[in-house]
């Protein structure tokens, strides 16, 4: 069953679907993630609000990404295992989540 949580000053639905945790704003699943990957999607709404909600989801679930805008273009800064990378934003982009290495 879906639960609606506040992300920022507006309600964003947070729920489980097909093995993913999903953050949905209006009709768009803006962030989907599981233990292996994070999928970002603006639904074509590259607005300050969408960007802010994505970043608040990242902060709330400690996903390690930050969406920013430079000269009108969106970028994603992704930090995993203390390694930072910057990517051009594309709807449906997938960030691979890094696994911790366990030594016996």
For each feature predicted by the language model, list its residue ranges.
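Terminal leader/tail segments of proteins
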Residues: 1-104
